[in-house]
């Protein structure tokens, strides 16, 4: 075997090892990757039962129902579509109707989103980029969503009021 053939064999072997390593990493990450969807995206796409994703939107007013023990059901809306959500656990303190929420879980066969994690909007200026984009696209965006309260990070000096 010539020197050139050995070099090509080494490069080919290294390429095979690299492809196998990338394949193993992607296979291991498949279970931990969670995609974000809005209710409209869920209704338009055929997301199969059992597929994990994050559902983001606003808790629809009047939809919150507390059941036995820690069972809670509510609806998440983005203004264009609504998805029913079932959750068993302790809700965040800031969770309420009309507020932003992100729930992580999967759809069941009846089309109910079974959440195992619920995150509430943590301040009045936070809105996930995907939810903001969806609201803008559907024409439900309000300009006051972008206004920051005085003293908030990124608020203008004029909005902060007089300094001491």
From Swiss-Prot:
Regions of this protein lying in the Cytoplasmic compartment: 1-7
Membrane topology label: Single-pass type II membrane protein
NCBIfam families named in the record: PRK13254.1-1, PRK13254.1-5
Protein name: Cytochrome c-type biogenesis protein CcmE
CC terms in the record's Gene Ontology section: plasma membrane
Disulfide cysteine pairs (residue numbers): none
Family as reported in the entry's similarity comment: Belongs to the CcmE/CycJ family.
Pfam families the record matches: CcmE
Keyword Transmembrane: yes
Spans annotated as Disordered: 137-164
Chief place where the protein resides: membrane
Positions on the Periplasmic side per record topology: 29-164
Annotated heme binding sites: 122, 126
GO terms assigned for molecular function: heme binding; metal ion binding
Keywords carried by this UniProt record: Cell inner membrane, Cell membrane, Cytochrome c-type biogenesis, Heme, Iron, Membrane, Metal-binding, Signal-anchor, Transmembrane, Transmembrane helix
Biased composition (Low complexity): 153-164
Function of the protein: Heme chaperone required for the biogenesis of c-type cytochromes. Transiently binds heme delivered by CcmC and transfers the heme to apo-cytochromes in a process facilitated by CcmF and CcmH.
Stored PANTHER family: CYTOCHROME C-TYPE BIOGENESIS PROTEIN CCME HOMOLOG, MITOCHONDRIAL
Location relative to the cell: Cell inner membrane
GO biological process, one term: cytochrome complex assembly
Ranges of compositional bias, category Basic and acidic residues: 137-149
Transmembrane segments: 8-28
Gene it is expressed from: ccmE
